[in-house]
Amino acid sequence: MPSKGSFQWNAVRFSNKVFCVTHAIKNSMDWDYLIWLDADTYTFRPMPASFLEKLLPEDSLVTYLGRGDKDPECGFVGYNLRHPEIQNLNDEWEDLYINDGIFKITSGWTDCSSLIHLTKKYQKHKGVTVNDIGHASDVKGHHVFINSVLGLYMDHFKGNRKESGTSWKKDFWPQSHKETKNISQLDYWKQIK
């Protein structure tokens, strides 16, 4: 559980992102998917549509970067707008922040805390599937974004990395997947410190 003074208890700060995402979902229903990408990300090489299609399975409600027992990394989240539960999830997520339900969540009040709270609830009670491209896919390390398949195309300047303008070499963990095994050898990643 985060300490009392932690940013993770700032519901107002994180409600902005939740309201942005829920508004986008409501206004994008002519599309199949909505992808949230934090503004502090950098795409360093072209990403083929086939890559995104593989990340966003038709049967999954959301695709996210899980971190095991910690809240997910929500710098990238794919929302399946054709899933029969997407509107319910969206309405319930927004409602947490409008009607103070967020304050009942004991792990934190961030967008990440509330999203994982709801997806676990939907998995348990509604039988939905989610696509965890982080720890559930055997990605190692705390900075799951760059250690996942997303690191083949993007960097996420989370936290103090904004100052340096890149992630750090120490963020990389040895990978066991064929697809990401040599990720740190891509030209972009070879230049970081």
Where are these regions (language model features)?
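A short glycine/serine-rich beta->alpha loop
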Residues: 4-10, 65-66, 102-103
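Active-site-proximal specificity loops/subdomain of glycosyltransferases
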Residues: 1-29
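Conserved donor-nucleotide/metal-binding helix-loop-beta segment in metal-dependent transferases, i.e.
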Residues: 41-74
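Short aromatic/hydrophobic "clamp" motif used to bind/position activated sugar donors
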Residues: 34
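Active-site acidic Asp-centered loop
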Residues: 37-38
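A residue-level signal for conserved active-site and pocket-lining positions in enzyme catalytic cores
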Residues: 21, 77, 115-119
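Catalytic core and acceptor-binding pocket of nucleotide-sugar-dependent glycosyltransferases
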Residues: 82-193
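Short glycine- and hydrophobic/aromatic-rich loop-to-beta-strand nucleating segment
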Residues: 75-83
